[in-house]
Curated annotation (Swiss-Prot):
<keyword id="KW-0150">Chloroplast</keyword>
<keyword id="KW-0602">Photosynthesis</keyword>
<comment type="pathway">
    <text>Porphyrin-containing compound metabolism; chlorophyll biosynthesis (light-independent).</text>
</comment>
<keyword id="KW-0560">Oxidoreductase</keyword>
<dbReference type="InterPro" id="IPR000392">
    <property type="entry name" value="NifH/frxC"/>
</dbReference>
<keyword id="KW-0479">Metal-binding</keyword>
<protein>
    <recommendedName>
        <fullName>Light-independent protochlorophyllide reductase iron-sulfur ATP-binding protein</fullName>
        <ecNumber>1.3.7.7</ecNumber>
    </recommendedName>
</protein>
<keyword id="KW-0411">Iron-sulfur</keyword>
<dbReference type="InterPro" id="IPR030655">
    <property type="entry name" value="NifH/chlL_CS"/>
</dbReference>
<keyword id="KW-0149">Chlorophyll biosynthesis</keyword>
<dbReference type="InterPro" id="IPR005971">
    <property type="entry name" value="Protochlorophyllide_ATP-bd"/>
</dbReference>
<dbReference type="GO" id="GO:0036068">
    <property type="term" value="P:light-independent chlorophyll biosynthetic process"/>
</dbReference>
<comment type="function">
    <text>Component of the dark-operative protochlorophyllide reductase (DPOR) that uses Mg-ATP and reduced ferredoxin to reduce ring D of protochlorophyllide (Pchlide) to form chlorophyllide a (Chlide). This reaction is light-independent. The L component serves as a unique electron donor to the NB-component of the complex, and binds Mg-ATP.</text>
</comment>
<feature type="binding site">
    <location>
        <position position="14"/>
    </location>
    <ligand>
        <name>Mg(2+)</name>
    </ligand>
</feature>
<dbReference type="GO" id="GO:0051539">
    <property type="term" value="F:4 iron, 4 sulfur cluster binding"/>
</dbReference>
<comment type="subunit">
    <text>Homodimer. Protochlorophyllide reductase is composed of three subunits; ChlL, ChlN and ChlB.</text>
</comment>
<dbReference type="GO" id="GO:0046872">
    <property type="term" value="F:metal ion binding"/>
</dbReference>
Amino acid sequence: MKLAVYGKGGIGKSTVSCNLSIALAKRGKKVLQIGCDPKHDSTFTLTGFLIPTIIDTLQSKDYHYEDIWPEDVIYAGYGGVDCVEAGGPPAGAGCGGYVVGETVKLLKELNAFYEYDVILFDVLGDVVCGGFAAPLNYADYCLIVTDNGFDALFAANRIVASVREKARTHPLRLAGLIGNRTATRELIDKYVEVCRMPVLEVLPLIEEIRISRVKGKTIFELEELEPNLKSIGEYYLNIADQLLAQPEGIVPQELADRDLFTLLSSFYLSDQQTEKAYSSIQHVHGSVGEGCSAQNSEQNQTANDYSFEFI
C-alpha cells in the first residue's frame, strides 16, 4: 500500500505522517516513510536528526547509482519505521517532482521499493503543480490533512482537484480528510456535506502533539515515558486501522473556487445569506451531497464556468 499525504503548509503533515507510520508499524506492517520536502525534515521525529537526502547521496557518488547501497539512503527510525528524505533542488532552480522521481528510481534499483507493506510519501505543502503532484503517480491513496480553517480547506480543495485529475490515468483514490489541531469542525463538516468524502479522524488541539515535534519525538515514543499520552496515540491507530481495511476510496470532485468561498463564508453570515449561498451552490451541483460525482463531466464543466457573486 502506498500513501501520499498532502495539506496546507504548516498544517502538521509531517507530525501526522510520522505518528501514522508508527501506528501502521504497530499493526505489524513494514513501513517506509519518504519525505518529499526540500527542507528534508519529514522524518526528524522518527530518527531524531536530519538524515542525508537522496540528492546529497547521489551528488556525492556523481550520480553513479551502482555505487549506492540501501544503507546509504535508508535510515532506521523509531518503531521499526525506515526513513528516506528525497531532498530537493537548489532554491529557485530545478523541479521537486524530478527529485521524487529519482528517489523512486533509486529505491527500485536497490530492490527496496517493493519490500515494504506500506510506503508513505509526506509531500511539500499544498503545492499541486505537476512536479509535487508526482507522488500521486505512485500512490494507492491520498490523505489530505486540514484544520477547521478557511485557508486549509481551500488548499484541500485544490488537492482534491489534483487527485481527480491523476485518477483519470492512475489507480488513485482519495482515502479521506484528516482534521488536525482542530478544536471545532463546523467548516470541515460543511465542506464534506457538499463535496462528499470520508473524514478519517479529527485530532483535537492537543498541546502534547505540538511539544512532541519540538522535542523531536513522536507521541508513541513520548508515551513510553508518559503513559497518560496513550489515548492520543489511539487517534493515529484508528486512522491506520481504516487504511489497513483497504477502503474503496473515492474519486472526488472539487468545488469551483467561488463556490467554495461562498460555502465557507456562509458560516459567518446571517441565516438569510446562508440560504442564498446554498441555493447558489445547489444550482450548479444539484442537491447538497451530490457535488462530488466525478463521472458527471458536464456538471463539472458547468461548475468551472459559472460565476457567482460574492456575498
